Amino acid sequence: SVQVTLYSDKAAVHNALVGVDGFGDTVAGIKNAVAAGLIVSINTPLCSVNRDYADTLRFAASLGVRYATCSGLIPSGSATTEGSVATRLSASELEDVLRDAVEIAASLGMELDFTSPDWLPEETLRGLGLRLIPSCGACLSNMAITPDGTVVPCQSWLGGVTLGNILTDPWEKIWTDPQCAAIRAE
């Protein structure tokens, strides 16, 4: 399976949040992965700029995507700037976006999960119809690969710890790295 971060169904919004003109490549990657028969999931960090998430789900479904995850905008990398922090959704705003998203995902036959631990109470998430209660999956259920091949504990872990390079290091060496094992144990 493969997960692709898609910030929006609108090129201008996706590109503004990513900081580069990458929407076309992102969509092409999704289409190629679906055409190759891979299980494709999109991930969308939610903020005030892309709060029309239901439209993104509709777009993803039209590309053949059946799995989606979303999260709050995690303050890491360039998302720590004052302007970026100002776009974070409040708990009530996030709940409203998720309520619409759960309904749309169900109508499209998509599976939707929210992946930000401790952002919303478990009761709220269950009340919205979300079955999976988020917990940190760094080095356990997910890792991320940066454009140069560097492996990091998760897509939100963009500073500090690196676990190897997928282009030059065997996967087993990366997986069994003491840092990786320590993060899994936390």
Map each language-model feature to its residues:
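Membrane-interface junctions of multi-pass transporters
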Residues: L130-P134, W157-E186
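Radical SAM enzyme [4Fe-4S]-AdoMet core and its adjacent flexible, acidic
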Residues: T5-V152, L158-N165
